[in-house]
């Protein structure tokens, strides 16, 4: 995947949109990168809070936050508008990982850099063959003055219209 084979190693983007696999193992990518203790890829090991090797390596059983870190590494920092990311996650990205572990470090890094603009809770049954709760994370590295230090939480769980005919477990669309 793009975690171990970055197709755009030195490119930055204005807008990035993705829906990474939920709960999918990224062990193959981890092995290709050299194993958990050996990763030196600057997308996943950075300097933060005085730690020269602040690690953002998650459990190999769920790589969705790793895909977000990959996107964060591709934000434009030298332009007036910077970059904006919208990425769909299941609920595990909000709470997995103990303090000091990769998932927790990623969330801390995002919050301390004030990149998280909003989290939108979507209606259940929005995706084919899964009824799990999903959330859109909106991130930017150029918040407006009035939005700095704030994160907007949007409950859109009731903003749906039912489908006439189910598509697997998908039974509604965002309205």
Residue spans of the language-model regions?
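SAM cofactor-binding core of SAM-dependent methyltransferases
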Residues: 1
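A conserved structural/catalytic subdomain of Rossmann-like adenosyl-cofactor enzymes
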Residues: 4-175
């Amino acid at each position: 995947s793009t975690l171990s084979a970055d197709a755009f190693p030195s490119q930055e983007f204005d807008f990035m949109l993705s829906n990474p696999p939920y709960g999918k193992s990224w062990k193959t990518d981890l092995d290709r990168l050299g194993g958990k203790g050996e990763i030196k890829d600057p997308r996943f090991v950075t300097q933060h809070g005085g730690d020269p090797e602040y690690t953002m390596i998650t459990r190999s059983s769920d790589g969705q936050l790793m895909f977000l870190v990959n996107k964060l590494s591709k934000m434009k920092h030298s332009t007036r508008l910077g970059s904006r990311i919208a990425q769909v996650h299941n609920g595990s990205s909000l709470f997995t990982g103990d303090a000091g572990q990769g998932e927790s470090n990623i969330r801390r890094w995002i919050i301390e850099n004030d990149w998280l603009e909003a989290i939108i809770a979507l209606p259940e049954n929005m995706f084919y063959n899964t009824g799990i709760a999903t959330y859109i994370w909106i991130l930017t590295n150029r918040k407006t003055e009035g939005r700095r230090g704030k994160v907007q939480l949007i409950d859109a769980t009731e903003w749906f219209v039912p489908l006439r005919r189910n598509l697997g477990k998908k039974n509604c669309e965002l309205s």
